């Protein structure tokens, strides 16, 4: 099966409100498509796990990690549990969630930080992605709550029930600093380990 076929199979299911979210691959120029009384949604695939392989700022760190290790990282991240779907259509010619995650210097494509922004969105709290998340609020409203979103997309392993917090891949102090990426080999390997553990758990 293709990644697209797996996405269709995984996310065509009942929503928290009881409605069925049927996804189609038959709409021209649309990766995944849904249209019903609950709305029209054009969805695209996006990676959960980020290796930072293409970030020049940490090229010197990657050079310290063996090629075999880098290949293992990529092999895991390019499996089904390493991906999710977001709305893929532009609204008013503005950036999509996928693009905003990558362009925002306070997120740097990290999914743990993206998920924290989504959590804050559901609570109406300011965050670095609030503008783009508000733009696609109809999509997030399908899941009724942050808990509903986590459950629908099988993200529960990123949530710590004991302290009611995201399980971040790097230390997080609520400040959303710019360039939240590893600064040395040890930080990078810890980041990769935590991220990889989540991808593996999500696939079980």
What are the functions of these language-model segments?
Residues 38-79, 143, 159, 163-186:
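Intrinsically disordered, low-complexity acidic Ser/Thr-rich regulatory segments
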Residues 2-7, 11, 27-28, 58, ...:
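Generic structural signal of hydrophobic/aromatic residues within well-ordered alpha-helices
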Residues 90-93:
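Short, glycine-/Ser/Thr-/acidic-enriched flexible segments
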